From Swiss-Prot:
Function: Component of the Nup107-160 subcomplex of the nuclear pore complex (NPC). The Nup107-160 subcomplex is required for the assembly of a functional NPC. The Nup107-160 subcomplex is also required for normal kinetochore microtubule attachment, mitotic progression and chromosome segregation.
Pfam families listed in its UniProt record: WD40
Keyword Cell division (UniProt): yes
Protein name, as recorded: Nucleoporin Nup37
Amino acid sequence: MKQDASRNAAYTVDCEDYVHVVEFNPFENGDSGNLIAYGGNNYVVIGTCTFQEEEADVEGIQYKTLRTFHHGVRVDGIAWSPETRLDSLPPVIKFCTSAADMKIRLFTSDLQDKNEYKVLEGHTDFINGLVFDPKEGQEIASVSDDHTCRIWNLEGVQTAHFVLHSPGMSVCWHPEETFKLMVAEKNGTIRFYDLLAQQAILSLESEQVPLMSAHWCLKNTFKVGAVAGNDWLIWDITRSSYPQNKRPVHMDRACLFRWSTISENLFATTGYPGKMASQFQIHHLGHPQPILMGSVAVGSGLSWHRTLPLCVIGGDHKLLFWVTEV
């Protein structure tokens, strides 16, 4: 391994707007390209990208915009629906956004004439996280600074409502058992809810605040990761409600934590935009130091490719992609 893990982005894509959030589609979409969505001050853009790591005849990255959706307000979060398919006739693009006006918008498009959106209203403060139920895609969970986690159906009706003790920062759905939901709070508590019984069944404590982001490891659902204060933290929920591992990473406070979709030992973190740049790091649990470090002028958002050890971050009028090894 190289001594210096710092490096520039492997690939970049120019965008027409500052990128606040970016998300690879985490679900199989029936097509060879990888769907990606990013949001700026006014728009959500849906595109496909293919990388040389997966297609021999591609040089670097091949990117194509499929559709731009007018949003009218800053986009803060994006979640893909598992109902999205590129191989159906017509194709189905389905995703939802959270925005600065405290509303969730559910978009459906066939990439031709049908472009619909529905507004889900109810949160009374900033929405920090949202996610579709990964099996059927018939429900959306969201968490907010208003100290609630809410479950919505696709008609915009709230089907469940959990009162939190502090702002809700992240929400994740169990990939197989869709009645299990993980909610992370800013006060350092991570709770698992049983949606059938509508009650908490387990909780973890970070012992550090503020907890800014947490993520359930989809390769091993006994693992949960988070960033709180300057540190990353990892729990094994079968062993303790306190972290098994933790390490300081970002001097200017850590911001986001995301597990890789292909390895239970690989994860990425970002720091808050500092005076000069946002720090981005990829970590491997077998290595004491980050295996890759990058810096983005004004970075926000963080997402892993579904099948490659590749991350994307949004920046000033661009998307930046980093590649690592598993």
